[in-house]
Amino acid sequence: MKMEVLSVQNHIQGKFGVNKIKDWQASTAPLEEEEELTAGVNGNTAAGEGILDVDVVDGHPASVLHMRQHQALNTRPSATPPSAGGGGPLAGGGSVGMTTPKQATSPVAAASFEAPLSGGSAAAYHHAYMTNVLSSTAQQHHPLPASPLQSTACARFGAADNLDDVSASAVRELSQQLQAQLRDAKRRHLACTEVTLPNDLTQRIAAEIIRMSEREPCGERACTLFIEFESEPNKVKRIAYFKVDPDTVSIFELYLTLRQDKSGWSSLVPQFIKNLTRSNTINISPDFTLTKKKLYSSE
């Protein structure tokens, strides 16, 4: 009961300013410490309002833009702050350090992104970060792979410019023999006024003959060549044959099949008009077939 009376008296004394009870005295030291702490907090808040520095670009804090740039470049900053001056805190007593990106394998992420720590401004770090990104991208140049449309000159079978592995003089000599045999075949076996050949056809045929004769003891000199003409599908006519070297015994044969090219406009002209105008021309296709037949046993 005594404690309850004291509590009521204390309440009355605090309300009306009366202090007649001497056996209970409140300590004023805790109140003074609380007032000092409150004043210190308010002072720091007021001082902080004057020195608050937040960089905003296009309505977003620089830290948000920095994070988005890291996401766009597939790099993430590490959580450990960089050590400057023996790992001490930043100038001004701050204990928060700037983060540096992790080491990555991409050319952009492999650059050095260490920003200057003087001042501790987010704008300075942002500027240094973007400068390092642009410089590392410009320094590392990777050539683009070749386009699949850029095909090589040797891709087509028997191309005219695919003659590096054969003798040019042998190709020229054998090509002249082929042209002479085709002129004679036109006069004797082909009912036409002229025969047109692709410009590089005889050179390609000669090169293929030489390649197919490489494993033979005497090369192309021991070859007998048969020339056949296919005017229609499954309609083949032999128009010429000759020995490449008459003084060498033939030990293998090659069968050359030429085809008529019907992709030109002259194939659309009726045959009786060709006979009236005497303009019957046979166009030889650039495609040909070369078949080898050995006359001896390899065993």
From Swiss-Prot:
Gene3D superfamilies assigned to the protein according to its UniProt record, in alphabetical order: RTP801-like
Residue span of region Disordered: 73-103
Keyword set includes Cytoplasm: yes
InterPro entries, alphabetized: RTP801-like (IPR012918), RTP801-like_C_sf (IPR038281)
Alphabetically ordered keywords of this record: Apoptosis, Cytoplasm, Developmental protein
Disulfide pairings: none
Biased composition (Gly residues): 84-96
Induction: Expression is controlled by homeobox transcription factors. At larval stages, induced by starvation, and mildly by hypoxia in midgut but not fat body.
A GO BP annotation: response to oxidative stress
Location of the protein in the cell: Cytoplasm
Transmembrane segments: none
GO CC entries: cytoplasm
Family: Belongs to the DDIT4 family.
PANTHER family given in the database record: DNA-DAMAGE-INDUCIBLE TRANSCRIPT 4 PROTEIN DDIT4 (PTHR12478), PROTEIN CHARYBDE-RELATED (PTHR12478:SF16)
Role according to the record: Inhibits cell growth by regulating the Tor pathway upstream of the Tsc1-Tsc2 complex and downstream of Akt1. Acts as a cell death activator during head development.
Protein name in the entry: Protein charybde
Organism, scientific name: Drosophila melanogaster
